[in-house]
Amino acid sequence: MNKTWQISVPGSTANLGPGFDSIGLGLSLYLQLTVTLQDTWAIIHLDDNGPKEFELEEHLLYVIAKKVAEQYGQQLPACRVEMASELPLARGLGSSAAVIVAGIELANQVCGLGLSVQDKLNLSSQIEGHPDNATASVLGGLTISSMDEKGNVDTFHINKIDASFVVYIPNVELKTSESRSVLPEQFDRAYAVHASANANMLAASLMARDFQRAGRYMEEDLFHEPFRAKLIPEYSEIRTAAKKNGAYGTALSGAGPTLISIIPSTIAGDFVQTMKKQFPEHQVIVTKADEQGIQVREYMKRLL
């Protein structure tokens, strides 16, 4: 009998328009790990949403777990890790943040680190470089966060969001580094004030659960979407069609290329069917806000 852990981490969307690098939302699309202690390391991907070929020492999950264990003075024991993911790579659905959060939790469990939720928020955000996706994967729900120069994260968290979300996933990858390369190095003061005001209105509307207004401000970003739009397949067409069919608003999911709409849950079925017909080159999926964040179950497993 070997000790085994099942670790579930929600994917996420970041920004929701003008909430650049600070607003995140956990989604009901998951990275699932089954981790079993054994004599040698093995990482097995059970689907296509993972690297097809890799060296163990370069796999992000292993790199993060080993780094965290060593940071706390522990040696990471060998494990068999089976990974199943609903998060396509480089599509703007928090796949890398989910693996980072999973790696931290793997080290926490197999090394008995006893990490607090705050520890996980800090570690994951420091590794990611910003707290939007990381906090959403740790906590679930809506997160509005700030990280100081020492890497300490402060998060406002709402776990229940009474709306549905539709993602439009194109069959192309877009690396975050490429998407960041088109952004300006600086803005003038008046532009920055306007952009910040829109971000403030988005955050306030989400906190007030005023999704009509939140949807409006999702489409009023000035920090990144005007510059990234040219990289995104059917960016304007999807936004226009979504609004026509009843969406509150549509924005890039993270750095793209996926787009995400917030919609009333009552129209979800008809909305998705209509958008699928209009955009057959995209995978159109309705999802909800995850309300729990990272989940862990421990049990004993008999190895054959």
Curated annotation (Swiss-Prot):
It is found in: Cytoplasm. It comes from the Bacteria. PROSITE patterns: GHMP_KINASES_ATP (PS00627). Pathway: Amino-acid biosynthesis; L-threonine biosynthesis; L-threonine from L-aspartate: step 4/5. One of its GO terms (biological process) is threonine biosynthetic process. ATP binds at P88, L89, A90, R91, G92, L93, G94, S95, S96, A97, A98. Pfam families: GHMP_kinases_C (PF08544), GHMP_kinases_N (PF00288). InterPro entries: GHMP_kinase_C_dom, GHMP_kinase_C_sf, GHMP_kinase_N_dom, GHMP_knse_ATP-bd_CS, Homoserine_kinase, Ribosomal_Su5_D2-typ_SF, Ribsml_uS5_D2-typ_fold_subgr. One of its GO terms (cellular component) is cytoplasm. Its EC number is 2.7.1.39. Gene3D superfamilies: 3.30.230.10, GHMP kinase, C-terminal domain. Keywords: Amino-acid biosynthesis, ATP-binding, Cytoplasm, Kinase, Nucleotide-binding, Threonine biosynthesis, Transferase. It catalyses: L-homoserine + ATP = O-phospho-L-homoserine + ADP + H(+). One of its GO terms (molecular function) is ATP binding. Catalyzes the ATP-dependent phosphorylation of L-homoserine to L-homoserine phosphate. NCBIfam families: thrB. Belongs to the GHMP kinase family. Homoserine kinase subfamily. This is Homoserine kinase. It comes from Lysinibacillus sphaericus (strain C3-41). The gene is thrB.
